[in-house]
């Protein structure tokens, strides 16, 4: 087994010696010539022999010294002395190493918000002096352009099942934006076209993945301070750390489990999970893995054994401890309340940036939004077959078409909100009942209703830029990204006050002209109808206040920067050092 070698260099002494020698030689040559020629030659010399070119790139923890050459004719001025003061890099704080383990990561594979988080959060943490490694399965569906750039790092056989059956583990590596991505390779488990198939196949697949990810870290001789696992697919990682791997190097790591959606828990037959995981019998008890007499719950076990449990918003961290939102785990979560923390997600503001978005008819920032959003509205109307009219209010809906997203409420209110001044655009796929209902509305309200029954990233960008408001009336919403993207693009969100929607959208206050959108609390179609009508009233009767809200939304910080700092503080708090 080859050990990974890390080289560290320091250029502090080099920069210092270069500065002294250059200053000395320049002073000596300048004083021998006349004043006029001295100034000319010294200026040329300083530009040509700038010591900045001699400074080597160093790791983020080492200070860089940048020195500007001073031109000395007789006595150096105060300004010249100030130029010789070394500049320091910003203090990025303590350094930690974190291994992210999850079932998907954009741009390699993505089916939902988990893929966005596994992509954007590690990149933001890398900028904060965190050494990050992301581990995901090497699915067959990963685009070939990424597969071709992966490098083989090694392979080994691993005991998996309770009977000690051996399975191949291959490691392929890809690096980008300061983050190392390691892909666990095994054709038996990951040759399907879709990351998720059914629990019969997914349970063995993710038992294997959780154990293989930790075994790969040991094989690579890369011991993280923190192992950060995500959702039920990686929830066995904390259990493996404290059982099968407790006497290995990686067993020293602290474990963090993030719940992106409590509805999905990895519940299946106890004997099946016990066999495939190979975990000891003592973890299969009612306080850990056992869901009922017959089933085991992988997420429940991860909650019990992890050092910290996070959710993707503050409100959701509280909601999941109630019977209404607890999905059968409310009592278990209340028992572990002391280690639950909510941190709101951000979005990748490089990808979602209307000022640089090449998919738009006209890019814009907060200064040009009011004008250029009209151009994008016209382009959206033309492309989707809607009546072209900049004076109409366009309301968008970008969502999976499922019960969770509040679509039964939307179906109830559509007939009431449709008029000659309003258009609705729906983008998404899901339950056939909702797909068919929206197709019916498209036929009924021709020219004013569009049902785009598919998910198309290009169309999504254009809806965010071209619509005036965006509906997110979810039954529950752990965090939600659509409302964050909507605000980034100046589309006013209309949301239900739940989970991350409540944390990120401040209700509009007509008396103070403040707020980011329109909200309603109880899950009732009448309240959604009222919220939409309040939005329409402001849009048509007080456009100045509406435009003010558009600008406020675009100026709102929805990036990962603040959230990444909270995660780093958590990592440092969990791994104190002298």
At which residue positions do the language-model features occur?
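Catalytic cores of nucleotide-sugar-dependent glycosyltransferases that transfer UDP/GDP/TDP-activated
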Residues: 2-6, 12, 53-56, 64-578
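Long, intrinsically disordered low-complexity tandem-repeat segments
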Residues: 12-47
């Amino acid at each position: 087994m080859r050990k990974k070698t890390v080289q560290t260099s320091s250029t502090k002494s080099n920069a210092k010696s270069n500065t002294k020698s250059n200053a000395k030689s320049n002073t000596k040559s300048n004083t021998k010539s006349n004043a006029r020629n001295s100034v000319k030659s010294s200026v040329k010399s300083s530009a040509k022999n700038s010591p900045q070119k001699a400074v080597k790139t160093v790791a983020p923890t080492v200070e860089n010294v940048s020195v500007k050459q001073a031109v000395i004719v007789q006595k150096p001025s105060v300004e010249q002395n100030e130029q010789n003061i070394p500049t320091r890099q910003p203090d990025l704080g303590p350094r930690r190493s974190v291994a992210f383990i999850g079932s998907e990561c954009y741009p390699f594979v993505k089916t939902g918000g988990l893929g966005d988080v596994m992509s954007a959060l590690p990149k933001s943490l890398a900028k904060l002096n965190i050494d990050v490694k992301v581990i995901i399965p090497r699915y067959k569906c990963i685009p070939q352009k990424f597969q071709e750039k992966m490098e083989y790092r090694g392979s080994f056989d691993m005991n998996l099942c309770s009977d000690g059956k051996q399975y191949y583990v291959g490691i392929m590596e890809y690096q980008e934006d300061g983050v190392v991505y390691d892909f666990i390779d095994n054709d038996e488990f990951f040759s399907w076209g879709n990351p998720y198939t059914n629990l019969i196949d997914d349970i063995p697949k993710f038992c294997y993945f959780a154990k293989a990810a930790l075994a790969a870290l040991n094989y690579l001789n890369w011991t993280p301070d923190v192992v950060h696992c995500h959702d039920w697919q990686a929830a066995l990682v904390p259990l493996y750390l404290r059982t099968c791997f407790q006497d290995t190097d990686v067993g020293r790591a602290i474990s963090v489990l993030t719940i992106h959606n409590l509805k999905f828990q990895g519940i299946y037959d106890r004997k099946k999970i016990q066999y495939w995981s190979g975990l000891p019998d003592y973890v299969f008890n009612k306080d850990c893995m056992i869901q009922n007499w017959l089933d085991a719950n992988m997420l429940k076990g991860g909650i019990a054994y992890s050092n910290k449990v996070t959710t993707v918003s503050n409100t959701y961290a509280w909601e999941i401890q109630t019977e209404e939102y607890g999905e059968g785990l409310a009592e278990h979560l209340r028992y572990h309340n002391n280690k639950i923390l909510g941190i709101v997600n951000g979005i990748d503001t490089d990808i979602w940036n209307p000022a640089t978005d090449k998919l738009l008819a006209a890019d814009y920032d907060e200064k040009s939004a009011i004008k250029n959003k009209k151009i994008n509205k016209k382009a959206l109307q033309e492309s989707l077959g809607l009546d072209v009219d900049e004076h109409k209010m366009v309301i968008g809906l970008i969502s999976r078409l499922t019960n969770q997203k509040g679509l039964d409420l939307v179906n109830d209110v559509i007939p009431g909100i449709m008029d000659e001044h309003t258009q609705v655009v729906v983008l998404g796929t899901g339950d056939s009942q909702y797909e068919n209902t929206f197709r019916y509305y498209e036929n009924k309200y021709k020219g004013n209703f569009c049902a785009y029954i598919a998910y198309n990233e290009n169309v999504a960008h254009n809806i965010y830029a071209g619509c005036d408001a965006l509906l997110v009336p979810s039954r529950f919403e752990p965090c939600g990204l659509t409302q964050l993207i909507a605000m980034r693009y100046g589309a006013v969100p209309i949301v239900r006050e739940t989970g991350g929607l409540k944390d990120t959208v401040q209700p509009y206050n007509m008396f103070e002209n403040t707020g980011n959108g329109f909200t309603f609390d109880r899950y009732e179609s009448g309240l959604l109808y009222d919220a939409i009508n309040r939005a329409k009233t402001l849009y048509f009767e007080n456009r100045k206040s509406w435009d003010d809200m558009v600008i406020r939304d675009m100026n709102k910080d929805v990036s990962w920067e603040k959230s990444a700092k909270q995660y780093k503080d958590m990592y440092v708090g969990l791994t104190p050092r002298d």
